[in-house]
A protein has these predicted regions:
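Acidic, Mg2+-coordinating active-site environments of NTP-dependent enzymes
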Residues: 12-14, 37-45, 61-62, 66-153, ...
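Gly/Ser/Thr-rich beta-alpha loop segments that engage phosphate groups in nucleotides
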Residues: 49-52, 80, 92, 162
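ATP-dependent carboxylate-amine ligase catalytic core
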Residues: 1-59, 75-77, 105-106
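A generic structural signal for residues located within well-ordered alpha-helices
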Residues: 23-26, 87, 165
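Hydrophobic alpha-helical scaffolding
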Residues: 101, 160-163
Length: 171
């Protein structure tokens, strides 16, 4: 597998193009693996996320998910939350549902505009979807309340409020 990817990298450099980054090489290897294994469904996580991410060549995903956007990767994505949100909104595809975690208002505005522009249905968990969050040595548990007010008790072997928020996106 890696020999094929290495050969493709060499072909690029022989044409005077820059060698792909480590992440781009790993992403190419993953895509090749998925193809060779005839995967029906792939849950693919972006690197930094966004328009320029190596994973963003999937043109018709089943769904896109955007977790919490904050002031990270600023040298690549922008210097304000709005700029970073705009870059990360690049994974939203036309007529493809997108799920977003709770965001700062400025971020939500950017995501809503991009989703509307691309006719992509935007879903966000209710602000109060996570209730009674408790931590222990085994992780955490919380009650999740859906849009229709169905309630589930969720246990995760992870800790951190952001993990609960990510779980809410998945649910």
């Amino acid at each position: 597998l890696m020999e094929k990817v290495e050969k493709a990298c060499l072909a690029l450099t022989e044409k005077g193009l820059p060698h792909p980054t480590s992440f781009e090489v790993e992403t190419a290897a993953a895509f090749l693996y998925f193809k060779e294994e005839n995967c029906d469904v792939v849950l693919l996580e972006t690197g930094m996320g966004g328009r320029e991410d190596a994973t963003n060549l999937i043109t018709h995903p089943l769904c896109s998910v955007i977790t919490s956007i904050s002031m990270d990767h600023m040298q690549f994505l922008g210097n304000t939350l709005s700029e970073i949100a705009s870059a990360k909104a690049g994974i939203i595809k036309e007529n493809c549902p997108v799920v977003s975690s709770w965001q700062e208002d400025v971020v939500t505005e950017v995501l809503v505009k991009e989703a509307e522009r691309l006719r992509a249905q935007l879903y966000q968990p209710k602000k109060d979807a996570i209730r009674d969050l408790l931590y222990d040595m085994n992780g955490m548990q919380f009650d999740y309340v859906s849009e229709d007010n169905s309630q589930w008790k969720i246990k995760l072997p992870l800790t951190g409020a952001y993990q609960a928020a990510n779980a809410a996106c998945a649910l």
